Amino acid sequence: MSNQPYDFIAIGLGPFNLSLACLSEPLEGVKSLFLEQRSQFDWHPGMMLEGVTLQTPFMSDLVTLADPTSKYSFLNYAKLNNRLYPFYIRESFFLLRKEYNLYCQWVCSQLSNVSFEQSVTKVEFCQQSECYTVTCKTPNGEQHYVTRHLVLGTGPAPYIPDCAVQSNSNNVLHSSDFCHRLDELKAAKRVTVVGAEIG
């Protein structure tokens, strides 16, 4: 455990916290840490359909609207990874979901304040120090971190109503598992879609 507390620790690494990691890393005097339980960034892997785009233009990447000069912009990623001209030639301001995921993975590889395989098991607040102690389970054992502030970005959990689960759980799936069960769905004689979300 470090003696000096972090200014903030963020738990979970989706696009929101990844954006915060990009914007906070270059700030002098701000000590931050981003903890993620998975082994790498993987944005909605069960929903990576071929040819599907984001619903917002590329300028709403992780940083551009807050800091257009950031080295973590999508355009910088595209230039450094020989993707700028293919993106331009595609003639769409809307990123493919797969390209966005690759962009986010690239950003993670550039950041020094991101730590994977850190499953947070406990958070305790100490009145005396006015700090939180964050306990994580890692492949190398238990880790403890101290921070003045917490940022939670754990994202929503897939929800299937009890009545659907009880009816026949083998035939019910959440859209987040769609690509993982695509062959099974293609073989099905009937498919019913219930509910929808925009976003």
Model regions and ranges:
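A conserved short coil-to-beta-strand element within the FAD-binding core of flavoproteins
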Residues: F116-Y132
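N-terminal Rossmann-like FAD-binding beta1-loop-alpha1 element of flavoenzymes
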Residues: N3-L33, V191-G199
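Glycine-rich dinucleotide-binding loop and its adjacent helix/turn
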Residues: T154-G199
